[in-house]
């Protein structure tokens, strides 16, 4: 697991941050449309290549989260996008969850999906150059939420995902996001967030995930 720890440390070294460039095609279409640019594969690639080629990449960015489309593309210099990112000293990563869906017995809450076929996808992403991954769990706050069901289900999914990712030689970003929306107090947010994170780490330990080889977001 020392290699995973080295990857995590490289991503976060010298105060560098992680660039989230994993916007879906739909999100990129809205973003480019706002400046009257057609959302073609070529234009989406040009937008991202401009980001990844900037001088600030070398001093400010330790890791880049990519979208499935982008990790498979080549730059104008014929480098793959992961190669372009690596040449700046950053680590290429990939979003692997498939989105949040309604949680069966709690229709106001969400469960993040993407475990089906994850091992096979990770093998492909590793060959393409990815060395870390992202998975986001989403929790809402109100008088009755997040429910125990939501806390347990999302923590379990995050732990299973993390275990599979580490098996495949990559560092998992563990992202249990407690949404700020609502009329709750800051103290409520602190208490619920603490409960969520505690459960996540309980599940990570149960699934024998190496904590030195993860990044908590």
Where are these regions (language model features)?
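Alpha-helix N-cap and loop-to-helix initiation/capping positions
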Residues: 35-39, 110-117, 146-157, 184-196
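Alpha/beta catalytic barrel-like cores
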Residues: 1-128, 141
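Amphipathic alpha-helical interface segments within eukaryotic helical scaffold
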Residues: 168-171, 176-178
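Conserved, mostly hydrophobic/aromatic
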Residues: 40, 135, 174, 216
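Structured alpha-helical segments in the cores of large, soluble enzyme domains
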Residues: 118-132, 154-170, 196-207
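Proline-centered loop/turn at the N-terminus of a beta-strand
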Residues: 91, 171, 213-215
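Conserved radical SAM core fold
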Residues: 99-103, 138-145, 179-183
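Catalytic alpha/beta core domains of metabolic enzymes, predominantly
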Residues: 207-217
């Amino acid at each position: 697991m020392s290699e995973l720890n080295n990857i995590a440390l490289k991503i976060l070294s010298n105060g560098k941050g992680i660039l989230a460039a994993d916007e879906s095609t739909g999100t990129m279409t809205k973003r480019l449309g706002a400046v009257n640019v057609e959302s073609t594969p070529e234009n989406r690639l040009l937008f991202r290549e401009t980001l990844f080629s900037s001088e600030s990449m070398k001093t400010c960015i330790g890791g880049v989260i990519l979208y499935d489309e982008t990790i498979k593309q080549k730059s104008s210099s014929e480098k793959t996008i992961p190669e372009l990112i690596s040449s700046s000293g950053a680590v290429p990563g990939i979003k692997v969850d498939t989105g949040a869906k309604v949680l069966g017995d709690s229709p106001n809450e969400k469960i993040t999906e993407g475990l089906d076929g994850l091992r096979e996808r990770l093998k492909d992403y590793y060959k393409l150059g990815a060395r870390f991954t992202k998975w986001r769990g989403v929790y809402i706050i109100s008088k009755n939420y997040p429910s125990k069901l939501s806390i347990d289900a999302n923590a379990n999914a995050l732990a299973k995902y993390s275990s599979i990712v580490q098996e495949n030689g990559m560092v998992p970003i563990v992202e249990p996001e407690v949404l700020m929306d609502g009329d709750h107090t800051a103290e409520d947010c602190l208490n619920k967030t603490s409960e969520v994170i505690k459960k996540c780490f309980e599940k990570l330990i149960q699934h024998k995930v190496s904590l030195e080889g993860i990044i908590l977001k």
